[in-house]
Regions:
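Residues at alpha-helix caps and immediate loop-helix transition turns in enzyme cores, especially N-
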Residues: 22, 49, 79, 225-228
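Active-site HxH/HxHxD metal-binding segment of metal-dependent hydrolases
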Residues: 45-48, 55-139, 231-234
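Conserved beta-strand hairpin/beta-sheet module of binuclear metal-dependent hydrolase folds
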Residues: 1-57, 162-176
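Short Pro/Gly-enriched beta-strand edge/turn motifs at strand-loop
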Residues: 7-15, 119-123, 144-148
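Residue-level marker for buried hydrophobic side chains located in beta-strands
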Residues: 37-39, 68, 91, 172-174, ...
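Short, surface-exposed connector motifs at secondary-structure boundaries
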Residues: 33-36, 60-64, 144
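Metallo-beta-lactamase
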Residues: 44-45, 140, 147-236
Length: 238
C-alpha cells in the first residue's frame, strides 16, 4: 500500500489495516535509492503475505536489502528469519535486541505473558535470527541516499529503537511500540517495559523534527507527526 513515493505499508494486522496476518505489526518499506529497507518483519506465521504485498506494490524481493528491527517482540521480529533467508537482507538493530532475537526465548520476549493473555496462540514460536549490524542510540548512518538516526525506545522493551529517517525533504519517525496514534503508550508486565523508560525515551524525542508518524500498530499520520510525540509527552507530564 503506497503511502507516498518510496514509502509503503506492506504488512499490518487486526490492530491496523489488516493487510496480512492477524498478529502482524505494521511493516513498512522505504526506498533508499540503493534498494529497499523494511522496518520490522511481522509475526512470522504467514510472512509470505508481506512478500505478496511487496510484489503487488511493484517491489521485487531482490531489491529488499535491509531490515531495521525496532525490537524483538514476536509480532515485530518473528518474520525476520524468513526475510533474511528469502531476500538475503541485512538485519540492523541494537545490541540488546539482537541478543533477544538470536535466543528467541519466550520469557525474554514476553511471549509467556502474551500467550497467557490470549494475544498469541499457545503453539506460537518465534524463529531465532542473527542480526548483521549493531547500531546504538544517538548513532546516525546512511542507507543509500537516506539518512537514519537512532533514538531510544527503551520503556517498551529493553533495548528498543525508534528510527528517524530523512527522505526526500521529509522526516519519517518509525516508533515501533514506544508511541502509537494520538500519543498512546502501552504499559505491560514484560521484560524492559516501564513507565520511567517511556518517559526517558519520549523526552529524548522532543528535539526531533517529525513530519510523518509511523507507529508499530494502528493508525499512522502523514502530516503533523510531531503532534503524536507531543501528546505522549503531555500525557506523561513531560
Amino acid at each position: 500500500m503506497k503511502l507516498f513515493e518510496g514509502l509503503h505499508l506492506v504488512g499490518s494486522g487486526f490492530e491496523g489495516l489488516f493487510l496480512t496476518d492477524r498478529i502482524d505489526c505494521n511493516v513498512y518499506a522505504f526506498d533508499t535509492g540503493e534498494g529497499w529497507a523494511l522496518v520490522d518483519a511481522g509475526v512470522g506465521r504467514e510472512p509470505f503475505l508481506i512478500a505478496d504485498v511487496l510484489e503487488g506494490d511493484g517491489i521485487s524481493p531482490s531489491d529488499v536489502k535491509y531490515l531495521l528491527l525496532t525490537h524483538a517482540h514476536g509480532d515485530h521480529m518473528g518474520g525476520a528469519a524468513y526475510f533474511k533467508e528469502r531476500f538475503g537482507l541485512e538485519i540492523i538493530t541494537s545490541e540488546v535486541e539482537a541478543g533477544i532475537a538470536a535466543r528467541a526465548i519466550d520469557t525474554e520476549m514476553g511471549l509467556d505473558v502474551a500467550k497467557a493473555s490470549g494475544y498469541y496462540p499457545q503453539d506460537y514460536k518465534a524463529l531465532p535470527v542473527e542480526a548483521d549490524r549493531i547500531v546504538s542510540v544517538g548513532e546516525s548512518f546512511s542507507l543509500g541516499d537516506v539518512r537514519v538516526s537512532c533514538y531510544s525506545a527503551a520503556g517498551h522493551s529493553p533495548g528498543g529503537l525508534c528510527y528517524l529517517v530523512e527522505k526526500d525533504g521529509k522526516t519519517l519517525l518509525f516508533t515501533g511500540d514506544l508511541i502509537t496514534h494520538r500519543g498512546q503508550i502501552s504499559l505491560q508486565d514484560v521484560p524492559g517495559n516501564s513507565l520511567e523508560g517511556h518517559k526517558g525515551s519520549i523526552s529524548a524525542l522532543g528535539a526531533a523534527k517529525v513530519d510523518i508518524f509511523l507507529p508499530g500498530h494502528g493508525l499512522f499520520a502523514m502530516q503533523a507527526g510531531k503532534e503524536h510525540v507531543e501528546l505522549a509527552a503531555e500525557g506523561l507530564g513531560l
